[in-house]
Amino acid sequence: MPMTHEELLAKNAFFAATSPASLKKIAAAGIVRSLQRGDVLFNEGEVPDAMFVVLSGRIAIAIGNRPLDSRESMLALMEGGDLFGELGLLDDGARSALARALEPSSVLQIPYSAVKAELQSNPTMLWGVTKLLASRLRVMDEVLSDSVFLDVTGRTAKRLLELSDGNDEFVLPVTQEELAGMVGASRERVNKAIASFIRLGWLEQSDRRYRIKERSKMSARSS
């Protein structure tokens, strides 16, 4: 039996210190939005008024290289239960990144106004907010560390292992261009890295289907 929106929110760090009564009100204020692949939820620079929780599918959080070109760097991949778009609630700033569906997806759109109303009457909610922000900082620290200490081949190995979700055989859930954005390199350099894994016998590839043959060696290359 699928979880209710209220139950889904309760499992998220942001709402870890939120009372059941407040969760019920926040969930009731949410609106379900259905998205097709490529649909943009919001763009970088827009004025925000809501946060989102992924109900199904995958959402990419990315920053662009405009006006120089159309390349993007994917900062995060949001999946079922993940919350994003909360920063504007805390600092009233514009969106710092864009959010786009990578496949047919649905999200729960939660107005900031509903969350702010509960924060005023239940300030202990801030403990959950702090917990989520701390986890965000840890992720950004890891991304920064990867960019400094791992080359493109190492970052490609790491992203493939993450996208495999622990399975040796998997279908890549993103395009080659999107994978390049996650790695922070050109598509050509990422393809060369993948080709090197295949040549070494660590990986097999058929279109978007992959089979990891030497997970330990891939893991060592990504650390």
Model-identified regions with their sequence ranges:
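Cyclic-nucleotide recognition modules
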Residues: 74-131
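Short phosphate-coordinating micro-motif centered on Lys-Gly-acidic
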Residues: 41-46
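A generic structural signal for short hydrophobic patches within well-formed alpha-helices
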Residues: 23, 115-116, 218
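Short, Lys/Arg-enriched, Trp-marked, Pro/Gly-tolerant hinge/linker segments that flank
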Residues: 140-152
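Cyclic nucleotide-binding regulatory module and flanking cytosolic helices
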Residues: 1-37, 88-90, 121
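Glycine- and acidic-residue-biased ligand/ion/polar-headgroup-sensing regions
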Residues: 38, 49-64, 80-81
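Phosphate-/nucleic-acid-contacting segments
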Residues: 150-155, 160-223
